[in-house]
A protein has these predicted regions:
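Modules that initiate DNA replication and primer synthesis
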Residues: 1-2, 38-66
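Feature primarily recognizes SF3-like P-loop helicase cores of small DNA viruses
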Residues: 1-38, 64-438
């Protein structure tokens, strides 16, 4: 005969003296600590929960006196029940507002609403329209960058505050080392919290699991970029200009598709290069800023980051100013002559066919002349030898010319005739001035 257990009035509603009603507990828990669950990720009003251990600890504190065995398993089961009860459709990707610690900033009209709503990302900084000008931050940037490049940085950092890839750019800040450029990344991590992550561009391109780490992120910071040339660039280019869902993989999980809007901010001692991709598309996606040389008599301040982080509210206003300017310019960045030259220099250094085509004394452009692909490639190899350069392959050389035929007023043809009536490939519009020995 079962023994009835008299109910203790001090017991919570979800406990009957023998077991915990997980559904009832979950509902009571959600009333006290509101949560939503989107794609198996829990969200609080502060944004996504990166570590569920705190929630598990809260569950434990509530049930530990009612469970005598299997406590850890019970906590895990209740957490899964809470996720089911908190199910929500994905949050909208809001490109016109920014969720901040004390409310929502509306980008179209610059108004601020003091309310906290569930959202994909919440930045851990308060909006204060009367915040002081971030003098230490601005002084640091003036010491680090050319004045003409600071508006570009301002626009890009503002761009990173919203989940949008309309700018279709990634930013690289390049120096010789020791300038303090990576301090920018540390300040941004404090400004953006978990919406910014540290990572590696090389890893994103080459590791199929690394791209999933960009999910829900506004920014990925690579504070010591690997200088090895990328073997491929497909994923980097796709992420920078992403307009559709990307296929992501996690270990032990079936691949799935998500919207990715993370931007890249990279710091290094050289630019990002590719072994095989030397197209305009690869370089067009890059904003490259170069730092000033570190003054020989400068004494580094070990508390510089802390001093700049004390100005976060002012830095936020500064970033918003850049974002408004970018939006008004239809997401076209302000690019100084120096920054534009940086991209051109990097492009030339990775593709010496450009310099060859602008050289003198080896050939000249003449509409009524033609040259075979082999003869033109031999002239190019002679130029490389004279200039101590490595030559590209014959296939790539011809491909570069065909891709840029309009730029050089050339016409690719299959009707170049050699002695003996042999018909070969070549180009119309080139007169050779040298004839290297075969």
């Amino acid at each position: 005969m079962k023994k009835n257990i008299s109910r203790n009035p001090l017991w919570p509603d979800w406990y009957n003296g023998k077991k915990i009603d997980e559904v009832q507990f979950g509902r009571a828990f959600l009333e006290q600590w509101p949560l939503k669950c989107v794609n198996s990720t829990l969200y609080t009003l502060d944004g996504p929960v990166e570590d569920e251990s705190e929630i598990k600890q809260r569950i434990l504190e509530n049930i530990e006196e009612y469970v005598t065995s299997g406590l850890s398993k019970k906590v895990t089961n209740i957490l899964e029940t809470i996720k089911l009860l908190a199910f929500s459709d994905p949050f909208p990707i809001e490109q016109d507002c920014i969720h901040l610690q004390n409310g929502v900033y509306h980008l179209p009209d610059g108004t601020f609403q003091e309310s906290r709503l569930f959202c994909q990302n919440r930045l851990p900084v308060k909006y204060d329209p009367k915040a002081a000008t971030p003098d230490r931050w601005l002084a640091f940037l003036h010491e680090l960058l050319d004045d003409a490049d600071i508006p570009t940085l301002q626009e890009y950092l503002g761009y990173c505050l919203i989940p949008s890839t309309k700018g279709q750019k990634m930013m690289l800040i390049v120096g010789k080392g020791g300038e303090g450029k990576s301090r920018i990344g540390l300040v941004l991590k404090r400004l953006m919290g978990d919406a910014a992550s540290n990572g590696s561009v090389q890893k994103v391109e080459n590791n199929r699991f690394a791209r999933a780490d960009l999910e829900r992120r506004l920014l990925m910071i690579d504070d010591d970029m690997d200088m090895n040339a990328l073997p491929k660039t497909n994923y980097i280019k796709t992420i920078v200009t992403a307009e559709a869902k990307l296929d992501l993989e996690r270990k032990g999980v079936q691949s799935y598709q998500r919207d990715i809007y993370a931007r890249f901010l990279c710091f290094g001692n050289g630019a990002l290069t590719s072994l095989y991709d030397h197209s305009d598309g690869f370089f067009r996606r890059q904003l490259i800023l170069t730092t000033k040389d570190k003054p020989a008599d400068r004494t580094d301040d070990p508390f510089l980051v802390e001093k700049m982080c004390a100005e976060l509210e002012g830095i936020l206003l500064w970033c918003l100013e850049g974002l408004h300017r970018l939006v008004q310019n239809d997401f076209r960045f302000t690019v100084s002559e120096r920054a534009a030259a940086n991209v051109d220099t990097i492009k030339r250094s990775s593709n010496n066919v450009i310099d060859f085509m602008e050289s003198e004394g080896y050939f000249r452009f003449k509409a009524d002349y033609s040259i075979s692909s082999k003869e033109f490639y031999d002239i190019y190899k002679q130029w490389c030898e004279d200039n101590a350069c490595h030559s590209v392959s014959a296939i790539r050389f011809s491909a570069e010319l065909r891709q840029n035929d309009r730029r050089y007023n050339l016409e690719a043809t299959n009707n170049i005739y050699l002695p003996g009536g042999r018909r070969v490939r070549g180009f119309v519009g080139i007169e050779p001035l040298v004839h290297p020995c075969p």
